[in-house]
Amino acid sequence: MNISILLPTRKRLDLLKKSVQSLIDNARQPDKLQFLFAVDEDDNKTFLYLKQSKYPNQLALQFKPIGYENLHKYNNTLAGYATGKWIMFFNDDAIMKTKNWDDKIMDFEDEFCLLRFKEQTGHPYSIFPCFPQKWFYLLDHISLHGQNDAWLSEIAYMLNIMRDVDISVIHDRADITGNNNDETFRLRKYNEGNPEQKGDLHHIDMVKLRYKDALKINWLLGLMGQPNEFIIKNLENKSDPFILLKEKFDVYKKAGAVGAGKQNARVTDQREIKVSYSNLSKD
């Protein structure tokens, strides 16, 4: 199996069909994809459909509804069933546009990194993260917070292992395109933007947990013959391990910071986190 696709979905069957079909139609080897779906128990329509659908190597799991703020729990569970060399997040409101996108991912097979697709907002995070299966095997989780893309991306920037890849995805989300302003979108809850509040993405406890993940991955990189001193040098020199992320956010801000519904973390130094919305502050 080449790529395992994690796809939590809630009461968006028509969107889900369109999203999955875009991945299949544009893949060179769709038979080497694995589709892993998470469906809430109160979304029987979607689950019944997936019970009879025949997507490549599919598995659908039912969950008690735990909300968007616990998206990581859906994804961490699905990842335990992943058999692909790469694990990838996708959304039911996302459309793959690039032909042979699966080949472009496999081109990175010899490198341990986080892949960042192109999407119309230009957000510095990898909005649809794609990473080696070993990432999950090492940590026994993908994220410990509902903002999965932010969790993974901040680790990747700390280690300088974020890699842009020429794969384009349309994120057809209400605050970006004006489409799909449904209940699923409106009821989303972000635990982000209040770093003094326990459970927030940038509460000190969460920051420390990401550092632990990053240092474990750094250890693995050395074992794999891909030594990486980026984070170690920054910590030893008491310099900013988030400098690469800050530079990306500067570009993002100048471009207009599209997608106001997405809260954007702005890291000021290795110990202090400031958060704003789409109008990122200078400091």
Can you describe what each PLM-predicted range is?
Residues N2-S4, Q34:
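Cell-envelope/extracellular polymer assembly enzymes that use nucleotide-activated donors
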Residues R12-A27:
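Short, well-formed alpha-helical segments that are part of the catalytic scaffolds
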Residues L23-P65:
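Acidic donor-binding segment of Leloir-type glycosyltransferases
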Residues P65-A82:
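Glycine-rich, basic loop-to-helix element that forms the pyrophosphate-binding segment
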Residues I87:
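Short aromatic/hydrophobic "clamp" motif used to bind/position activated sugar donors
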Residues I95, K99-Q133, D164:
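Conserved donor NDP-sugar-binding/catalytic core segment of glycosyltransferases
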Residues F131-N148, I155-V165:
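Aromatic-glycine-rich donor-binding/catalytic loop that engages nucleotide-sugar donors
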Residues A150-D283:
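C-terminal catalytic/acceptor-binding lobe
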